[in-house]
Amino acid sequence: MLSTKFTLRSHKSSVTYIYQDPRTPFNLFTADSSGLIINWDLTIRRPKKSWQAHTDTILTISTIHNHLLTHSRDNTIKIWDESYSCILEIPCNALNFSNICVINDLLITPASINSNNLDVYKIDKDWQITRLIFDFDVYKLVNKGEIIEEIGSSGTSRNDFGIIMQMKIIHTNTTTTTSENNSDYIIYVGFESGDIVGLQLILPRARILSTTGNTNDKTLINQSAKFILQYHNSTHVPNPVICLSNLDSVLVSGSTTNKVIIHSDPIEIMKMDHSGIQAIVNFKNDRLIFGYWNGYIQYGDISINQSLPKLGNTEQEKSKLTKKLTFMTILNESNQETLQSPTGKSKYSVLLKSKRNLVSPLLLAGYEDGSILAYNI
């Protein structure tokens, strides 16, 4: 279908991130290339609050310990309290345009001293930070001869994968979970070279040893966290990996070309209608929606784009007037029960919200001109 349902307009710069608050489905955060964040109330489709969170492009919005987390090209990660005052600021490396990943109380980022490598941090509820892994070289791990799977290698030689371009955490039932690591997810890392590497993070539990016969005389031994290689694919080489998504717990990747790879066994290669795959979103776990740099959005046989006011007649002039797509995500349906009056009585505000209840998912697309369009799917 992909028909326009509504438009959100308040950003004056290119939209770079859209995030539905998992704590409150009608609460939406959007960010732009100037570092501005807008908090929307989707029941009235109006901003509730906006603030200058960063001084450069915002690359990631997430939550940790029930608090909002943001990450920017201004080399900072910030955590915000309920009034959106910054309560923790972490310096980070933002030489590339990679996102960061948050899983439980862990933060996975490009390494602070090398954009090719990884750091892992643990953030406690009292906001104490522990660095578990420092400057981890993924390329060296892959080239130890421990490669689980390498597909599509072009045979070209280089001594690194280049900078990290994109990261994605995918929960999976195939990962070996033990009492040592308690891990049921794979961290996929897409690189400038076109390589994609899947890593399992091992977090050994501390061991308690009795150094004497006295049960009260014990020594606590903390073992180091480590990565284990689970997957390597180089089908995209030499084109940088631009986006990572999932299809029913299977990785899906896109690059600067028109090639999309579904990383099943064996892999499936799809040739798309356009090059420059900006975004791939998973709809209901079994369907994919594709967004391209040139502004087109493709869902099955349906392809749409948004045009600016027409000023020219030639094809070249028309292409320049297409809105450039910058971000895309699914807005999940809300729970009707959250909109009921606590007294059980009908109120106008509750009825108004009920009319705008998200009874089905919407596709949210952010554009270079600062607009955000919601599409029926």
From Swiss-Prot:
Q: Which GO terms describe its cellular component?
A: nucleus
Quote the subcellular location field of this record.
Nucleus
Among PROSITE patterns, the record links this protein to: WD_REPEATS_2, WD_REPEATS_REGION
Q: Name one GO biological process term.
A: chromatin organization
Q: Which UniProt keywords apply?
A: Chromatin regulator, Nucleus, Repeat, WD repeat
Quote any Pfam family the record assigns: WD40
WD repeat locations: 10-50, 53-91, 230-262, 263-303, 342-377
Q: How does it assemble?
A: Component of the ASTRA chromatin remodeling machinery complex.
Q: What role does this protein play?
A: Component of the ASTRA complex involved in chromatin remodeling.
Its family? Answer: Belongs to the WD repeat ASA1 family.
Q: What is this protein called?
A: ASTRA-associated protein 1
The species is Candida albicans (strain WO-1) (Yeast)
Lineage, broadest ranks: Eukaryota, Fungi, Dikarya, Ascomycota, Saccharomycotina
